[in-house]
């Protein structure tokens, strides 16, 4: 909360996000997460090594789940302290959530060897995400929403895999979010995404943040009349290590 206070007072912060990380729902479903003091958090043990255990998984309840309830309580405290600052929330995209439940190599094999169970897993991930949005709406009313789905980029999966295993569930997530919040979410997908821009716009995405490997002008010309476009600033070379002038130029 002190960081939010200083950002508001010193930089005029007009919004903050209290959301779920890429692995949070995986942890809520039973995967063992590890968050080192220095470094990126990771899944130490996936809960769904074998689909024989799938029926043991239940849609998460943000009010009762020990991984989710503290985040919701944190959001309440922050909103009480900063009632004048807009609050948003976020989840991970369907496939990115799935690999926090089941190892990525198995999920990718499932696209060919076990599509029926993979569809069930992806459906579960969306239901868990929508439950989070429902809880947030119940507590705070309509807020801005976003999802990050790095695994759905064209560097990891093919366009055919995207069409069958990612797009239908992104569409379900978007439609469900609209029904709950009254507005569509934004999204960020890392890496190469140009082959799926039109699909994302067709799915009803409100805004899309592209990675710095893609061309902002090309994205604007392709789909800028159908969804907002953002992003494209190199996060390390410019934002972390660049000068002020380089940040502005980028």
Predicted regions span which residues?
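Segments that shape or occlude catalytic/ligand-binding pockets
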Residues: 1-19, 23
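Active-site loop segments of alpha/beta catalytic cores
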Residues: 1-3, 14, 38-42, 60-250
């Amino acid at each position: 909360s002190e960081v939010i206070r200083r950002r508001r007072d010193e930089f005029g912060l007009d919004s903050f996000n209290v959301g779920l990380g890429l692995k949070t729902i995986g942890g809520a479903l039973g995967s063992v997460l590890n968050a080192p003091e220095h470094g990126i958090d990771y899944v130490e043990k996936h809960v769904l090594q074998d689909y024989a255990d799938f029926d043991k998984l239940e849609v998460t309840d943000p009010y009762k789940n020990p991984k989710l309830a503290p985040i919701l309580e944190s959001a309440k405290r922050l909103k009480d302290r900063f009632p004048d600052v807009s609050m948003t929330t976020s989840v991970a995209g369907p496939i990115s959530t799935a690999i926090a439940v089941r190892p990525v190599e198995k999920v990718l094999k499932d696209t060919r060897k076990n599509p029926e169970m993979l569809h069930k897993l992806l459906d579960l991930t969306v239901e868990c995400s929508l439950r989070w949005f429902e809880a947030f709406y119940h507590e705070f009313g309509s807020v801005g929403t976003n999802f990050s789905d790095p695994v759905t980029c064209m560097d990891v999966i093919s366009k055919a895999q995207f069409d069958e295993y990612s797009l239908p569930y992104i569409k379900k997530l978007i439609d469900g979010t609209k029904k709950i919040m009254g507005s569509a979410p934004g999204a960020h997908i890392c890496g190469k995404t140009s082959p799926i821009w039109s699909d994302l716009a067709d799915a009803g995405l409100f805004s899309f943040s592209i990675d710095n490997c893609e061309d902002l002008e090309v994205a604007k010309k392709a789909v800028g009349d159908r969804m907002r476009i953002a992003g494209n600033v190199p996060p390390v070379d410019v934002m972390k290590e660049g000068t002020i002038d380089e940040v502005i130029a980028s």
